[in-house]
UniProtKB/Swiss-Prot annotation:
Residues that coordinate or bind Mg(2+) 2: D163
Family of this protein: Belongs to the WRNexo family.
Record's function text: Has exonuclease activity on both single-stranded and duplex templates bearing overhangs, but not blunt ended duplex DNA, and cleaves in a 3'-5' direction. Essential for the formation of DNA replication focal centers. Has an important role in maintaining genome stability.
SUPFAM superfamilies noted in UniProt: Ribonuclease H-like (SSF53098)
Protein name: 3'-5' exonuclease
Pfam family, one: DNA_pol_A_exo1
Matches recorded under Gene3D superfamilies: Ribonuclease H-like superfamily/Ribonuclease H
GO molecular function per UniProt: 3'-5' exonuclease activity; metal ion binding; nucleic acid binding
Gene field: WRNexo
Protein source organism: Drosophila erecta (Fruit fly)
Length: 354
């Protein structure tokens, strides 16, 4: 009887959602190979393809979700190769704009400041005379000779390099002023050791206070203050008012900034290197007699000071001439624009296009 019965499909209720039977494609499952650290990128790709199934997975009648982002399985060796390749062939920048500094370096072909190597400068070699005195009467006679030479000069200003030395101890601090060195001519330096002097000779005081003498040095004002403390017959203020600090003058002429030491100023202006030996610099300057190293050290300090003064004087005169010529050819507005751009006018500029 049952074979004559017809099975009718049962209609589902309106609220029920028909469920589709999940269809699973029959096939031979692929076994995914195990990944090891020593696998090359090609082997990793083959192993990955071997374990993939192109049929989207379905669960409970839902369509399979797309596979997630594949993990980076690059080996350390592969990563190193990629990094090296990127460093050799860096990506191009989108912007082609150049700053003013990079544009000028590109046009001039000059290397960037980061790649510039420090220039090796030759050491100073002083071959002039060194006149060294330790007794009061000898110092007075020498100072009188220099004073007479100054008065014979036709120039209104006679530059004189001035420097001092004194002993220093970390236990007791700075000692009394022991040495004064001066230079009015690059061919001769005078070194006066003050150890045996209770008072400076009057002619030496007159020399450094002479109206035509322009004393100059690096941080020279502090030297005058110390000299006045150690020898009351010296007044520091008149000397400070008329002296020239070479570091300050360099900033004005070359339009640089910061504080200068004599060594750095020598590198920058004279293009020379100084042998600032700590052994000599911290030596016993009050002990008579000074040795050859001390004498050469003291002489070079004032000799190179005179060289720097002459060079700054030359640059200042050239700068004034270049500025006046530029104003005549291009006008005041162009001159101000060039100064705003950082032009120092130490070299000649005929015309400019703005």
């Amino acid at each position: 009887m049952e074979k004559y019965l017809i099975k009718m499909p049962i209609k589902s209720k309106a609220s029920e959602v028909p469920k589709d039977k999940a269809v699973v494609k029959q096939g031979t499952p692929k076994i995914r190979s195990k990944v090891t650290k020593n696998d090359t990128p090609k082997e990793l790709k083959n192993k990955e393809n071997a374990g993939e199934d192109n049929t989207p997975k379905q669960t409970n009648g839902r369509l399979g979700r797309p596979a997630g982002k594949r993990k980076n399985l690059d080996t350390p060796e592969t990563k190193a190769e990629k990094i090296a390749t990127e460093e050799e062939n860096p990506p191009k920048r989108r912007s082609s704009r150049l700053t003013r500094s990079t544009r000028s370096m590109a046009e001039d072909g000059s290397p960037s400041p980061e790649k510039e190597k420090p220039e090796k400068l030759p050491f100073i070699k002083y071959k002039g005379a060194i006149k060294y005195y330790t007794e009061s009467q000898d110092i007075a006679a020498s100072a009188d000779d220099v004073l007479q030479w100054v008065e014979k000069q036709k120039d209104e200003v006679v530059p004189m390099a001035f420097d001092m030395e004194w002993p220093f101890s970390f236990q007791t601090g700075p000692g009394k002023s022991a040495v004064i060195q001066i230079c009015v001519d690059e061919k001769c330096c005078y070194i006066y050791q003050l150890t045996n002097l209770k008072k400076l000779p009057a002619v030496l005081v007159a020399l450094i206070n002479h109206s035509k003498v322009r004393l100059h040095g690096v941080n020279i004002k502090n030297d005058f203050r110390k000299l006045a403390r150690d020898f009351p017959e010296v007044s520091a203020e008149p000397l400070i008012e008329k002296c020239v600090d070479l570091g300050v003058w360099c900033n004005e002429v070359c339009e640089t900034g910061g504080r200068w030491s004599l060594e750095r100023l020598t590198n920058f202006i004279a293009k020379k290197a100084m042998d600032k030996s700590k052994k000599v610099r911290m030596s016993k300057w009050h002990v008579i007699p000074l040795d050859e190293n001390q004498l050469m050290y003291a002489a070079i300090d004032v000799y190179i000071g005179q060289v720097i003064y002459r060079e700054l004087e030359r640059r200042e005169k050239a700068k004034i001439i270049n500025e006046e010529e530029f104003k005549e050819k291009n006008g005041e507005a162009a001159f101000k624009a060039m100064k705003t751009l950082g032009e120092t006018f130490l070299s000649k500029i005929n015309e400019v296009t703005l």
